[in-house]
Amino acid sequence: MRAYADTGFLCSLYASDAHTNRAVARIESQRLPLAFTWLHQLELRNALRLKIFRRESTREQSTASLNAVLADVAAGILMPAAPAPFDVSTEAERLSAQWSSKLGTRALDILHVAGALVLGVDEFLTFDTRQAALARAAGLRVPRLA
């Protein structure tokens, strides 16, 4: 497993938004599996369902997106990963203490970067500038998603 995408990136991949074309292009060009943790599962599924409440998608569109996620897990595009919770928590606290006051990072963003570090991935995919700054500060490669 060499890449980790934050949930915002994954949401753009599975539900049309301003970043969808860039997310799809990146995945098609890299052909690497993406780590898919319990945090991704909860956050992505909830985000896709929340789009119904916000009237950004229909129930049918959200169901299709959820089914596409399941299909990509089965196809190995999303690779189930289980970083040790204690290790993620320890790394997250370290990142928070070192960077939150400087970068303005949020707890879920910190958890994603900590999870990526614990999993030992090579690169971190995000459209979030603060999360990208944290990932870079933590030593992860964050490609420019143009």
Identify the role of each PLM range.
Residues 1-43, 47-64, 129, 138-141:
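Short, well-structured N-terminal submotif of metal-dependent ribonuclease cores
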Residues 39-97:
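Active-site-proximal, substrate-binding regions of enzyme catalytic domains
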Residues 76-129, 133:
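Active-site neighborhoods of divalent-metal-dependent phosphate/nucleic-acid chemistry enzymes
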Residues 145-146:
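Short beta->alpha connector loops at strand-helix junctions that form conserved
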